[in-house]
A protein has these predicted regions:
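Intrinsically disordered, low-complexity serine/threonine-rich segments
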Residues: 6, 43, 265, 269-273, ...
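Compositionally biased intrinsically disordered regions enriched in Thr/Gly
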Residues: 21-250, 258, 282, 287-312, ...
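Glycine-centered tight-turn and secondary-structure capping sites
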Residues: 177, 254-283
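Bacterial N-terminal signal peptides that target proteins for export
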Residues: 1-9
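C-terminal motif of bacterial Sec signal peptides marking the signal peptidase cleavage site
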Residues: 16-19
Length: 356
């Protein structure tokens, strides 16, 4: 089940996960080789070592029809966030076993003396600190090969966790309510720089359909990477590797960011905007600068559509949304107008909110 970002972490509530320390997996396989690898922000995640299963059940390497080898991360600690992440990874492992048994094994036809067909899974752990909190991305690279095929075909899937250990989609990680059109446009722009590398009859609608904003992206401190499985966009059909499209966080921000307000100023305001929306949203009340206690969780947000300078003030207009980004039931509930004024240090501060 895909859970969305729990915004309380942005207010200092929640667990900061630093590093991906490994623990041995429970012994339930035929062959286990332990290899310990130091973890870092962008290196293979520490694992319990490659684990190999032979198929059908009870087979050995010599008489097996198929083999599955996988390295999966196991996070150490007793915190609820750690338990939640490990449970999600275990769920992914169970899906992998089902996929191999139902989809890969029936295609295996190992001739006598031939190499053993199989699937191999490796993983990568990426941690990122962003304006909306800290995220851990786990990337699973899944390759499979058969005797009658040239080279292995590789697929990629991801799990992205927030500080509470809950799974996030791109909307939750970015704070953008509908990131698909913006993300597809970024991929389209990247493709346009080398059009011969892609099928010639593709449209931006095809690009949108190829994106998986739940289990096909990762978060880095610089921005986001989207992954597209092989054979969908790339013209080189002999390349069995997924495509990667990376772009900065600001690519998903409103058009006025970078013009009327800098990226840094906007990112500094993001947690405050969600806090204000969650404070005023339940009662549909306007706000004139009075102090309030930050909410334990963010239940509302803003979709900002336009901005304009009025004297020394910056006026932002858009919609108040009930529900946090990433929630399927998020709904527009009111027209919102925010007034920002300059701080003494030069940045922008929230001055008032009018809902109608």
């Amino acid at each position: 089940m895909r859970s969305m970002l729990r915004w309380a972490a942005l207010m200092g509530v929640g667990l900061l996960i630093t590093g991906c320390a490994a623990q041995p997996l429970a012994p339930q396989v035929e062959e286990v080789v332990i290899t310990q690898t130091p973890g870092s922000a962008e290196t293979p995640a520490p694992q319990a070592g490659p684990i190999t299963l032979y198929y059908p059940e009870g087979a050995s390497q010599g008489d097996a029809a198929y083999a599955l080898t996988y390295d999966l991360p196991v996070f150490s600690g007793t915190e609820p966030a750690v338990s939640a992440m490990n449970a999600a990874i275990e769920g992914w492992r169970e899906e992998l076993l089902d996929r191999v048994e139902s989809e890969r094994l029936p295609l295996a036809d190992r001739a006598e003396g031939a190499d053993l067909p199989g699937t191999q899974v490796t993983s990568l752990c990426v941690e990122a600190e962003t304006p909306l909190g800290n995220f851990t991305s786990v990337l699973f690279y899944e390759s499979d090969w058969y005797e009658n095929e040239n080279g292995a075909t590789q697929r990629i899937s991801t799990l992205v966790f927030d500080e509470a250990g809950l799974e996030c989609n791109l909307a939750a990680a970015s704070g953008v309510y509908d990131p698909l059109p913006l993300a597809a446009q970024q991929v389209w722009n990247i493709m346009s720089m080398d059009p011969s590398a892609y099928y010639g009859d593709l449209t931006i609608a095809d690009v949108s359909e190829s994106l998986d904003l739940y289990n096909g992206f990762s978060v880095a401190e610089e921005g986001y990477t989207l992954y597209v499985q092989p054979g969908i966009l790339a013209a080189d059909e002999s390349n069995g590797r997924p495509l990667e499209f990376s772009f900065g966080r600001n690519a998903l921000y409103p058009d006025f960011v970078g013009d009327l307000i800098t990226v840094e100023e906007y990112e500094a305001l993001l947690p405050q905007l969600f806090a204000l929306a969650s404070h005023c949203g339940p009662g549909f009340q306007s706000w004139q600068g009075e102090a309030f206690d930050p909410p334990e969780a963010f239940t509302h947000g803003f979709r900002l559509d336009s901005a304009a300078l009025q004297g020394e003030a910056l006026i932002l207009r858009g919609q108040l949304i009930q529900g946090a980004p990433g929630e399927l039931e998020a709904t527009e509930v009111a027209v919102a107008q925010l007034t920002l004024t300059r701080e003494q240090g030069g940045g922008w501060q929230l001055a008032s909110l009018t809902l109608s």
